[in-house]
Amino acid sequence: MSLDAAVKKQIITEFGTKEGDTGSPEVQVALLSRRISDLTEHLKTHKHDHHSRRGLLILVGQRRRLLQYLAKKDIQRFRALVERLGIRRGAAGAR
């Protein structure tokens, strides 16, 4: 499940540090979080969709690795992002 261009652009402008910023960890984590929430809603109605469940686990792992990287590089940015997205610290992978 992919995001449509309008939603993606809105997330990029909200979490980006400058115009056209698509590669910062904050933007990447925000995009992954949106895809994760969309897939979670999909799996609530389609319980036996195991291919999508595997995709969800892959996305969660990618987000966890990006959050670990951000926590290692800049703990203040990590804490601000976790607070903005409402992610649990244990799910974020850093203490």
UniProtKB/Swiss-Prot annotation:
Lineage: Bacteria, Bacillati, Actinomycetota, Actinomycetes, Kitasatosporales
Function: One of the primary rRNA binding proteins, it binds directly to 16S rRNA where it helps nucleate assembly of the platform of the 30S subunit by binding and bridging several RNA helices of the 16S rRNA.
Any one GO molecular-function label of the UniProt entry: structural constituent of ribosome
Family the entry assigns: Belongs to the universal ribosomal protein uS15 family.
Organism this protein belongs to: Streptomyces coelicolor (strain ATCC BAA-471 / A3(2) / M145)
Protein name (Swiss-Prot/TrEMBL): Small ribosomal subunit protein uS15
Stored Gene3D superfamilies: 6.10.250.3130, S15/NS1, RNA-binding (1.10.287.10)
Gene Ontology biological process terms, A to Z: translation
CDD domains in alphabetical order: Ribosomal_S15p_S13e
Gene: rpsO
